[in-house]
Design a protein with these regions (language model features):
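Bacterial N-terminal signal peptides that target proteins for export
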Residues: 1-12
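C-terminal motif of bacterial Sec signal peptides marking the signal peptidase cleavage site
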Residues: 18-21
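Bacterial signal peptide processing site
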Residues: 23-25
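Short functional micro-motifs and their immediate structural scaffolds
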Residues: 27, 51
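Short cysteine-rich clusters marking metal-coordination/redox-active sites
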Residues: 43
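Cys/His-coordinated zinc-binding microdomains
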Residues: 47
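Thiol/selenol-based redox catalytic cores and closely related redox-interacting motifs
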Residues: 91-139, 143-145, 155
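C-terminal partner/receptor-binding element of secreted or periplasmic proteins
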Residues: 137-169
Length: 169
């Protein structure tokens, strides 16, 4: 191998290494922590202020972005993960933990659970913040089952939420 060719390969390798080091895609990096809903947080699909709507909220962190994408309903969180035009490099997904809801049923906007670890009550009588039936997330399966006993519906995990449920009108 000539010196020129060796130098070119070394330079190329150094560039690739530098770019990959700066990409932020370190698989060992911990996911970002959930953020508090701020007064200026706006729902991704509805464009409305999150604090103006009752019910559980969601936030998704896309790799390479510091701020989360906000959602005013849990069905919207699922839609974002399913729609082909939305980003697929997701660093973290959080939903309000309704196990921490107040006695009036209002979501505690400081209580978050990893969406992939949550238990969801779907097809219940609960009307979410956008005026439609919504999936209700819980960190605790027992609390989810109790909610379903009272409000109807069934308990499923993140991967088991049917697409036709997410996109039903």
């Amino acid at each position: 191998m000539t010196l020129k060719r060796w130098a070119a390969r070394a330079a190329f390798s150094a560039i690739v290494l530098a770019v990959s080091a700066c990409s932020g895609d370190d698989p060992a990096a911990p996911p970002p922590a959930p953020q508090a809903v701020s007064a200026d947080a706006v729902g991704h699909y509805c464009g409305m202020m999150l604090l103006d709507h009752a019910g559980p909220k969601g936030q998704i962190f896309v790799k390479g972005r510091a701020a989360p994408v906000w959602f005013s309903s849990i069905k919207q969180v699922f839609a974002y993960t399913l729609l082909p035009e939305e980003p697929k490099g997701l660093a973290a997904i959080y939903v309000n933990d309704m196990a921490a809801a107040g006695p009036d049923g209002a979501a505690d906007l400081k209580a978050w659970v990893d969406a992939r670890q949550a238990f969801y009550v779907i097809n219940s009588s609960f009307i979410g913040g956008m005026g439609a039936e919504d999936a209700i997330p819980f960190s605790d399966q027992t609390r989810a089952l109790a909610f379903a006993q009272t409000h109807g519906g069934r308990v499923v995990r993140f991967a088991d939420v049917p697409e036709d449920y997410v996109f039903a009108q």
